[in-house]
Amino acid sequence: MTGAVCPGSFDPVTLGHVDIFERAAAQFDEVVVAILVNPAKTGMFDLDERIAMVKESTTHLPNLRVQVGHGLVVDFVRSCGMTAIVKGLRTGTDFEYELQMAQMNKHIAGVDTFFVATAPRYSFVSSSLAKEVAMLGGDVSELLPEPVNRRLRDRLNTERT
C-alpha cells in the first residue's frame, strides 16, 4: 500500500488545494491531509474549523483522511506510516522554496516529495489572497469549495456587525 501526506495550514482550504488532493488520491492508495499547527501564526479559522472545512470539501475522496500535524512534517509522515509528501506548485517561486524543503526532508528522513503542477485555473489562488479579496467585498466563490465560501462569508459578516 502506498500513501502520501499533503501538508499545509489550509486557512482556508481552496479549490486549488482540493485539486491537488484529488490528483494525489488518484495516484496513492491513501492520502492524509496534514493540517499543520504553527504556534507563531494566528489564522482566520481555528484548527477545528480548518479540519471541518477540509473534511466537508473532500467527502468525495474515500481514500483521504484529515489529521493534525505538529513539528516536522517528516516526523508526521513517518508516524502515519507514509513514505511521501505531495506538494502543489503554482509558480517558480514555489518551486525554489519547496525544492529546498524536499531536499532537506529527503536528507534528514529519507522522505520523497512529489510535486504536482497546479491546474492553470488555480495558479493564482492562495488562501491569503482569497481571504484578502473576500475581506474587501470581492466574490471568491470560484476559488473556494462551497462549504468554505459559506464559512468565510459568515465569518466576515459576523466581524462587520
UniProtKB/Swiss-Prot annotation:
- Record bears the keyword Nucleotidyltransferase: yes
Q: Give the residues the record marks as binding ATP.
A: 9-10, 17, 88-90, 98, 118, 122-128
Query: Which keywords belong to this entry?
Result: Acetylation, ATP-binding, Coenzyme A biosynthesis, Cytoplasm, Magnesium, Nucleotide-binding, Nucleotidyltransferase, Transferase
* Activity modulation comment: Regulated by Coenzyme A (CoA) through feedback inhibition.
Q: Which InterPro entries match?
A: Cyt_trans-like, PPAT, Rossmann-like_a/b/a_fold
Organism domain of life: Bacteria
Q: Where is this site: Transition state stabilizer?
A: 17
| EC number(s) on file | 2.7.7.3
Q: Does the keyword Transferase apply?
A: yes
Q: What is its main location?
A: cytoplasm
Similarity annotation: Belongs to the bacterial CoaD family.
Q: Which PANTHER family does the record associate with it?
A: PHOSPHOPANTETHEINE ADENYLYLTRANSFERASE
User: What's the name of the protein?
Assistant: Phosphopantetheine adenylyltransferase
Provenance organism: Mycobacterium tuberculosis (strain ATCC 25618 / H37Rv)
- This chain is encoded by the gene named coaD
